[in-house]
Structure formats: structure tokens, C-alpha cells
Amino acid sequence: MSRLLEESLKTCPIVKRGEYHYFIHPISDGVPLVKPELLRDVSTRVIKMIDTDIDKIVTAEAMGIPIVTAVSIATDIPYVIMRKREYLLEGEIPVHQETGYSKGELYLNGINKGDKVVILDDVISTGGTLVAIINALKRAGADIKDVLCIIDRGNGQNVVEEKTGYKVKTLVKIEVVDGKVQILE
């Protein structure tokens, strides 16, 4: 199996804001450069880990979009983006989102009762975004088959499982130590 994701994480820049150390990576930030081979590696690994007998893939804007696009093209499964702005479409479901660094609303459109879905996102840290997505999908009557985040940083997996009952799959678990990304698993 390719390890492009892990190798690229080991060398990504770290930026300190206050007391928090942010890792800056193409998958989580879209900078400095998203290379096709990295996106291909990630999307191929995702496809092997998720239930593909589904109707739709769901992500929240913004950095889940390149990943779901690549997975959608490879699998012919359409995707839905939970947006940060309201569209006022019939059936739109608003849900409050709180992460470690922001609060706001997300809006779900394009999901019908009984739709089989996979949730896919770039990073899980606090779990706030995934809890919001899961809550919106439950309100819509969707059948959530899998939840997967590319990068796990923090305790978000436990938070999501405690609050929703869903286990979150990840490709890689990291932490930032002494200004560098450490791969944990």
C-alpha cells in the first residue's frame, strides 16, 4: 500500500496560533500544493475502507470537497456538500456546528429519507463537524453506512461515538510534537 499521505504529513509545515499548533497539509488545507498522486492515494484507500453500496457521499465544506470529488469520480456515486450558507431550498436542514476553533450553521440539502450514505471528511479533531453532520442526516432519515475521516488528530473519534453511536474510521492518526507531525498509527 502506498504511504504518500503519511510521508507528506511528516514533512508538512506547522504554524502556531496562540497555544495551538496547526499542521498545514494539502489534504486538510489545500496548500501548499495538492498533488494528484496524493489525492489518488487517499481516494483509493478511502474506497477500500467504505461501504460503496450507497446512494450518496456526504461532506461539509470546504476541504472534504476534493476528496469526495475524487471518490465520486472513481465510484460513480454522487455527493452532497453540507454548506455554510443557507439556500432556502425545500427540505433544507440547518444544524449547529461547534469545533475547537469556530461555531456556525451547516445546511443539508439533497438527502431523502432512506438514502444510504457515507460521511467523508478531511480531518477529525474535536468531532464537532461530524456530530453536526450525523445529526442532520438523522433528521433527514438517511441510513448512515460509514463515517470516515482522512486524518485523526485529537479525541474526536471518542466524542462522535459517545454522542452519536457511530464509529469513525480514519486513514492515519497523528499528533504534533515539538513542532513536527508524528504518525501514531
From Swiss-Prot:
The gene behind this protein is hpt
Complexes and interactors: Homodimer.
According to its UniProt entry, the function of this protein is described as: Catalyzes a salvage reaction resulting in the formation of IMP that is energically less costly than de novo synthesis.
Protein name per UniProt: Hypoxanthine/guanine phosphoribosyltransferase
The secretion signal range is none
State the EC number(s). Answer: 2.4.2.8
Indicate where this protein resides in the cell.
Cytoplasm
Major subcellular site: cytoplasm
Which SUPFAM superfamilies does UniProt cross-reference here? Answer: PRTase-like
- Origin species, per record, is Methanococcus maripaludis (strain C7 / ATCC BAA-1331)
Which Gene Ontology terms of cellular component type are present? cytoplasm
Q: Which UniProt keywords apply?
A: Cytoplasm, Glycosyltransferase, Purine salvage, Transferase
Question: How would you classify this enzyme at the top EC level?
Answer: transferase
Its family remark reads: Belongs to the purine/pyrimidine phosphoribosyltransferase family. Archaeal HPRT subfamily.
Pathway where this protein functions:
Purine metabolism; IMP biosynthesis via salvage pathway; IMP from hypoxanthine: step 1/1
